[in-house]
Amino acid sequence: MDQRYHDLALATDRCGSDLWAFRPFFITGCRVGSPPDGFSPNGQDWSFPPPNTVHHRADGYRLFAESIRKTMRHGGALRIDHVMRLFRLYWIPEEHSAKDGAYVRDRAEDLVRVLALESVRNQSVIVGEDLGTVEDEVRETLAHFGILSYKLLYFERDGPKFRPPAKYPVSALTSTSTHDLATMAGYWIGEDIEARFRARTIDDGVRLAQQKERAQDKQRLLDALFAAELMPPGYEHDATRIPELTGELHYAISGFLASTPSTMWLINQEDPTKELHQQNLPGTTAEYPNWGRKMRWTIAELASVKESRDCAAMMRLWIEKTGRGCSAVTAAAL
């Protein structure tokens, strides 16, 4: 299997070539976004047009199938950004804010079957990014078709406590974060909270509440790492006395996720170098340099720099310790 892992973006830009070439496939007068939640109290306006579901179906979903096929062509795995799009999208009427939108359903089973068919044809693993507000129906359908779910350390909880590795599902990709969330080092110092405050997507009251909650979560995470016997003997038990992410914490968190039974385990490129700033800050446009942060090194340089070699060695060590191995993953089932 080709080891490259690609991403299928959520939609086409309203000024993009797809919209100009296939105008009947898009709805004008509305934009897509997401409703208010804890991360974006005002909701999010992604400023792209929703699909014309009637026209897509009448055309046999050709445009959708071609976009999947082309993205799969040079890789062995495909991540579907916001996989809930196959089930419903949050439409915002023109001249209204994200608070005034509503969900509009799509023909999910048709779309998932097209996705599964292309997965088998191209022998590509499918990962559905199912974070945020997700109905039970979505995860049940993904599991039925063999599409991996997305399980992040930050969100996997049993009540307020972090879920132990053994309770993670098999049919999933696991990681600490995504491009939309805090890096590991940024999470530990609360840089993501400060970024939202600087961008004015949260006020000072929300900022203080989130800082208090983060302090509690850091202690819960540290407790979970100790409970999993991943921290070295004599290591500090009080998270308030650990001002920044240490090498020991990074190693233990990586081992925590490597120990899960989940099919895939992913380390984000920002974590080996302890980058503080995430790639994208949801709910912002000009307020944050979204997608403007370059990698510290080129792909060619990665093979020789110490940080990447150390990360590769750590991953090999955890693979050996956990018996995770590199077994093949089957494509989505029809």
Language-model region placement:
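Conserved, well-ordered alpha-helix/loop/beta-strand core segments that scaffold catalytic motifs
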Residues: M1-A11
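Short, well-structured secondary-structure segments
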Residues: Y5, L266-I267
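Alpha-amylase-like alpha-glycosidases and glucanotransferases acting on alpha-linked glucans and related
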Residues: A11-M264, E270-D271, L276, A286-E287, ...
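Structured C-terminal cap/extension of enzyme domains
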Residues: L266, T273-A332
